[in-house]
Amino acid sequence: MTDTPFHCGFVAIVGRPNVGKSTLMNHLIGQKISITSKKSQTTRHRVTGIHTEDAAQFVFVDTPGFQTYHKGALNEALNKSVKDSLGSVDCVLFLLEAMRFTAADREVMALLPKKTPVILVVNKLDKAKDKLTLQAFIDEVTAEFEFAGVEVVSAKHGQRLAELLDQVRPHLPESMPLYPEDMITDKNERFLAAEIVREKLFRYLGEELPYEMNVEVEMFEMDGALRRIHIAVLVDKEHQKPIVIGRGGEKLKKISTEARLDMEKLFDGKVFLQVWVKVKSGWADDVRFLREFGLD
């Protein structure tokens, strides 16, 4: 009896902002590593999530939402990240919100590779009132691009994800696993700590959050079993600092507390976290800063 061949490959998750890409990846790997928010382009780095099973390893790449509304070096770098991801994967998941096929979706569709299998993933299936309406929507989309497959899911509730993996699996090349079977991301704890703080900023500041905002880990040290982490929130202008800090420091305190609790859960250990805000004018349009933050 011959052994079942192992398959391993890279899968890009692409779509317009706020369509559920990060939520989908978090559910596919069974762990929250990519931050989620209603604000566009929450994901600013290509985050890799790994799902391993008996005969296959899926390496998912969560990309920033492609959009042209914001201008400047930061947005150009994020859009470039999407394009680069599409050129180096074995399969692409093109994520759409059910019953919404917008100009922004078509912009992403125009980037889809012709020689790499692309699976249409229709998310938020509860948006469709019945199966006939949903099928008509799918027919409209598939008339504009030749997809390798179609799957309807609910990323938020983790529904039909096994069926989605079944569609992806045949497109993975025969290969030994690239990562240990218990590894869920190639990002280190320093990166994940920064992402957790960014998520809390999005959650507590909402529409007040400056687009030109980033976080920088200034210290990450192990003190026995304790992680000591110092993180600076970077804003572009002085008047943006009070937005993040809040009256009497209340917002920043909530952000820091919730971030620390999430880190302790993810890292399975105690964390001492300090977060503060500082101005770094022009960073979002300075290619040197973007390169420093890995956003070039």
Curated annotation (Swiss-Prot):
Gene Ontology cellular-component terms for this entry are: cytosol; plasma membrane
Q: Which Gene Ontology molecular function entries are recorded, alphabetically?
A: GTP binding; GTPase activity; ribosomal small subunit binding; small ribosomal subunit rRNA binding
Q: Which residues form the KH type-2 domain?
A: 205-281
Q: Where is the Era-type G domain?
A: 7-174
The segments labelled G1 in the record are 15-22
- Name the positions where GTP binds: 15-22, 62-66, 123-126
Membrane recorded as keyword: yes
Q: Which SUPFAM superfamilies match?
A: P-loop containing nucleoside triphosphate hydrolases, Prokaryotic type KH domain (KH-domain type II)
Per the record, membrane topology reads:
Peripheral membrane protein
Q: Where in the cell is it found?
A: Cytoplasm; Cell inner membrane
Q: Which residue stretches belong to region G2?
A: 41-45
InterPro entries tied to this protein: G_ERA_dom, GTP-bd, GTPase_Era-like, KH_dom-like_a/b, KH_dom_type_2, KH_sf_prok-type, P-loop_NTPase, Small_GTP-bd
One GO BP annotation of this record: ribosomal small subunit assembly
The protein's job, in short, is:
An essential GTPase that binds both GDP and GTP, with rapid nucleotide exchange. Plays a role in 16S rRNA processing and 30S ribosomal subunit biogenesis and possibly also in cell cycle regulation and energy metabolism.
Q: Which family does it belong to?
A: Belongs to the TRAFAC class TrmE-Era-EngA-EngB-Septin-like GTPase superfamily. Era GTPase family.
Subunit details: Monomer.
Q: What is this protein called?
A: GTPase Era
Q: Which organism is it from?
A: Chromobacterium violaceum (strain ATCC 12472 / DSM 30191 / JCM 1249 / CCUG 213 / NBRC 12614 / NCIMB 9131 / NCTC 9757 / MK)
**The encoding gene:** era
